[in-house]
């Protein structure tokens, strides 16, 4: 048992299986073979990920990370398609939360289309931390830093941002509040 092998204050970061974070079923080489029927399925995430992680690690379970595989950019060309994916992902994350569950959830997006003010604000509302990282499929570090600052409440809201029509992060003026 891993939990017994580490200091009491140690916490494991556990990554969710791609069965719930990848829109495609894949072959042994990682090539898409079709649509993944368990993509964004909260019941599968609880049964195959949360339960085993909590049972095996107990109090030593740290952040549970959902690395969302890239969706092909052509599939996200329209505002309607981006909003639909946004709603599916945030509904999935909301379904994973239970009041007072104490779980630390984090989300990593491999599509720049999901690094929007609307997504960061919804993650904050859900108590889900964004993951920042260096990967060819992820936006540049500047965009990720802006997203993290937005998640922390450092950017102002506008109707365009909240509707999903804008993906521009606009810093708040000094002394203003959300």
State where each predicted segment sits.
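Residues lining hydrophobic/aromatic ligand-binding pockets adjacent to catalytic sites
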Residues: 1-178
């Amino acid at each position: 048992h891993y939990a017994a092998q580490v200091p009491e204050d140690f916490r494991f970061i556990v990554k969710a299986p791609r069965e719930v974070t990848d829109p495609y079923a894949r072959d042994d080489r990682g090539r898409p073979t079709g649509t993944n029927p368990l993509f964004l399925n909260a019941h599968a995430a609880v049964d195959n990920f949360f339960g085993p992680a909590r049972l095996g690690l107990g109090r030593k379970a740290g952040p549970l990370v959902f690395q969302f595989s890239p969706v092909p950019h052509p599939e996200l060309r329209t505002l309607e398609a981006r909003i639909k994916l946004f709603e599916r992902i945030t509904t999935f994350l909301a379904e994973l939360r239970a009041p007072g569950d104490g779980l630390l959830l984090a989300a990593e997006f491999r599509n720049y289309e999901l690094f929007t003010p609307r997504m960061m604000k919804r993650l904050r509302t859900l108590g889900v931390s964004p993951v920042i990282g260096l990967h060819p499929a992820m936006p540049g570090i500047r965009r990720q830093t802006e997203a993290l600052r937005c998640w922390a409440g450092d950017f102002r809201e506008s109707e365009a941002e909240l509707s999903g029509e804008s993906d521009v992060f606009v810093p708040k003026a000094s002394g203003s509040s959300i």
